[in-house]
Swiss-Prot record:
One CC-aspect GO term: endoplasmic reticulum membrane
Organism of derivation: Xenopus laevis
Catalytic residues (positions): C53, C56
Protein's name according to its UniProt entry: Protein disulfide-isomerase TMX3
Species lineage: Eukaryota, Metazoa, Chordata, Craniata, Vertebrata
Amino acid composition bias (Basic and acidic residues), ranges on this chain: 443-452
PROSITE patterns: THIOREDOXIN_1 (PS00194), THIOREDOXIN_2 (PS51352)
Residue ranges occupied by any Thioredoxin domain in the UniProt entry: 27-128
SUPFAM superfamilies linked: Thioredoxin-like
Enzyme Commission number(s) of this protein: 5.3.4.1
Bilayer topology annotation: Single-pass membrane protein
Task of the protein: Probable disulfide isomerase, which participates in the folding of proteins containing disulfide bonds. May act as a dithiol oxidase. Acts as a regulator of endoplasmic reticulum-mitochondria contact sites via its ability to regulate redox signals.
Root EC class: isomerase
Residues with glycosylation annotation: N258, N313
Topological domains, Cytoplasmic: 397-452
């Protein structure tokens, strides 16, 4: 027995050593034009990148780790990367519009990855998409095991039906976000009661909810809204995904490192309202908290002091702020009700003035971030163009002044010449008049003598 265990350990060590000796390029394949024809035979996880893209370079070591993780797990998924600037026709075929773009390709389906760019999240996404759309739960033990691993669980209960066809259709659309399962009624926990079968359930927040077509509307919309827990730790990626739900996002903005009563109180109040007022607010609001105000400030183009509470409308960029600090759940409920009845004043928006403000705010933020990260680079990037523009303006102004002075000098010369010519003419006329006067005088004197 000990010998068998030793052999097993040696086998693992040898296989790990062998894998470690394999270059990363063998685990992450560089793709070319042939990929277009050969891809349908396998499941692919592909990174579409551009050589000049900074985010692509940052993703590269993570992508290599993804290749190693998937290969060591024995997954059938093949990991590759393709230069979208060289093979632009392939990038266009898959609708690549930005870099990096991560896609899972399975048959004729292409799934976009929009989550955090970490090894764990990318691998989890790839394995979810590569597996079956609907995963069966044959026993209660399997159900309990899966429920512990997934905070949100969608389960179809029943035999073949129109509802199951819709469930499969929704799964093919939303498998990029969550898992979908099927089970018989006897596999479910004892506390679950169903009025009718077939049914679709979601297990989350230590309870379950049953889909009601009459109250909840379209199954796809219901799944899209229910795929989040009732209270979340919200970051930029989560907030982006919450935009698809159509809900307002109620966020307690705090500093998680600050254990003062002000920070812990606003978070606990938000949790309390989310849990105890689900029936009133769940359809319209998603509750959560955000660590730090940097992201929220850039989103709102404002400087929020923390701790605070803000409600975001991601569809039109509007937001709502309470008129005073919230001290208890009753005040938070009152504030949320004022949003529902339209008495709360909305700020922000996506109008023309706000778009212009966004342009200037983004420009300011870019300049500040560059100077903070590298003052010398900032001086070079912004000082050099300003210097060139200043020299050009000075040259233009100086040229105008010199031209004006030269023009005035020419005018003065012309005026002086004209004045001199006028004086000469007057002097000549004077001489002529004098000559004429002398002749007249002589003639007059002659006539007087003749008379005498």
């Amino acid at each position: 027995m000990a010998a068998a265990g030793l052999c097993f350990i040696l086998a693992i060590v040898s296989s790990t050593s062998l894998l470690a000796s394999v270059p990363v390029s063998a685990l992450v394949e560089d793709l070319d034009d042939s990929f277009k024809e050969n891809r349908k035979d396998d499941i692919w996880l592909v990174d579409f990148y551009a050589p000049w893209c900074g985010h692509c370079k940052k993703l590269e070591p993570v992508w290599n780790e993804v290749g190693i993780e998937i290969r060591t797990s024995g997954s059938p998924i093949r990991v590759g990367k393709i230069d979208a600037t060289v093979y632009s026709s392939i990038a266009s075929e898959f609708g690549v519009r930005g870099f990096p773009t991560i896609k899972a390709l399975k048959g004729d389906m292409a799934y976009n990855y929009r989550g955090p760019r970490t090894k764990e999240d990318i691998v989890e996404f790839a394995n979810r998409v590569a597996g079956p759309l609907i995963r069966p739960l044959p026993s209660q033990q399997m159900f309990d095991h899966v429920k512990k691993r997934h905070p949100v669980l969608f389960v179809y209960v029943g035999v073949e039906s129109t509802l199951k066809e819709k469930f499969i259709e929704v799964a093919s659309e939303l498998i990029v976000y969550t898992y979908f399962f099927s089970a018989s009624e006897d596999v479910l926990p004892k506390y679950v009661t169903l009025n009718e079968v077939p049914a679709v359930l979601v297990f989350k927040d230590s309870t379950y909810f049953v889909y009601d077509e009459y109250e909840d509307g379209d199954l796809s919309s219901w799944v899209n809204k229910e795929r989040f827990e009732g209270y979340l730790h919200i970051d930029g990626f989560t907030l982006y995904e919450l935009g698809d739900t159509g809900k307002l996002v109620a966020v307690a903005v705090i500093d998680e490192k600050n254990n003062s009563i002000e920070h812990t109180r606003i978070k606990s109040i938000a949790q309390d309202v989310a849990k105890n007022n689900r029936n009133n607010f769940h359809r319209d609001f998603q509750f959560g908290h955000m660590d730090g105000n940097d992201y929220i400030n850039s989103l709102l183009m404002d400087e929020l002091s923390i701790p605070t509470f803000v409600v975001l409308n991601t569809s039109n960029q509007q937001y709502f702020l309470p008129s005073k600090h919230i001290e208890n759940p009753e005040e938070m409920i009152q504030f949320i009700n004022s949003i529902l009845d339209g008495t709360a004043e909305a700020q922000g928006g996506d109008g023309i003035l706000q778009r212009i403000k966004r342009v200037f705010y983004d420009a300011k933020s870019t300049v500040v971030s560059v100077f903070k990260s590298s003052p010398l680079l900032g001086c070079f990037l912004f000082g050099l163009p300003l210097g060139v523009i200043s020299i050009m303006c000075y040259g233009i102004c100086t040229a105008d002044t010199e031209d004006g002075s030269e023009e005035m000098t020419r005018k003065d010369v012309i005026d002086q010449n004209a004045s001199d010519e006028g004086s000469d003419e007057e002097e000549e006329k004077g001489r002529e008049i004098t000559d004429v006067s002398d002749e007249d005088q002589q003639e007059k004197d002659f006539m007087e003598k003749k008379i005498d």
